[in-house]
């Protein structure tokens, strides 16, 4: 029967791979994801989540399970097509995919053609989700992930100060407001998982990502990060704090070296660098964690059973799924050089506790070595089911099997970057500014001044602001040309 279905697939259009109309799968109060005409346990919204996970796992093939363990980068980076095509039935994701990252958010090949007006991007994600629900055998929905450390990483979403600026506010209530704005805009646009907050501790100013941290203090980072996680997940999204663990103190401040400074002792590692993550997991209940690409004491974190299982799951009780930072898995093989083959690489990260591999390369670059590692006995079927089950559990908790099409494809502009959200942005910007010294009462500037010198490399910059891991093409201009213009809400 499987051979017959595969043969027919080549002859049928993308909208008619399965017998009958795909509209028939949408029943009253449930969806017939596997298209068998029967309400299976995993399709029953009233069934307990653990029962739904177990039922779905029991129906999955090895190919379908391994496809859940990879990210497909969207927006033309890896996923070259803007919309589903008939050729997708020949791609490895014909058996599903774990998540799709940054699809139609304004970055990558497609730019603004899909991301704005906002309704365009919602319709795009809905059509891609519809393909996975209707054209794959079991119809497992995709988790649409995106960045969001300073506002949602989407074209013209509401921007906030970088996390170092947010940290300077020392305002937990404000961080919760920022989280709600980010979550509301993500929900309106159909994203389901936000890669935030960054909980790395910045104590070496040479490190190039200091600006992305809440600061140098683990209590501050933990308290603010907790509010961000609670705020995102209160709106039905998954929060994925990063980068776990001990990532922000590389030797010489060199991020690309991937080597944690050997002077970081175990006690310092636990009380300083791990404490914000512990709080995010145990006190805020984060559903995701992103593993980092550095090592600690010579062991790559993304391939460490101690970090991903003993600490994260056994000590802290983490119940979500672990996604790797981009290329963190491959670094075991290419930078850390502790695995002689790609199969050994796949086996080490999965056995350690990693659920989903992310990289800017096709998902089969990981899925195929993963399958070979399983066939060679390097990964047990029990471990495979455990890792895939953790992914599915999060998808059930997000409600993707009850409503695979979140988002407002009609009027998302009433939510995204609305006036109320701009007010929160302005409030955060003002509170993030800290005056350390005011020699000769220079501030506030006298209204009697006739001239103000605007000096620096961006003095005449007229392009819209592009930030790291926040809104793309934000309508903010900082230049000599615009400084004399009156402030307008749309410039926030």
Where are these regions (language model features)?
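Glycoside hydrolase catalytic-domain context in secreted enzymes
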Residues: 18-484
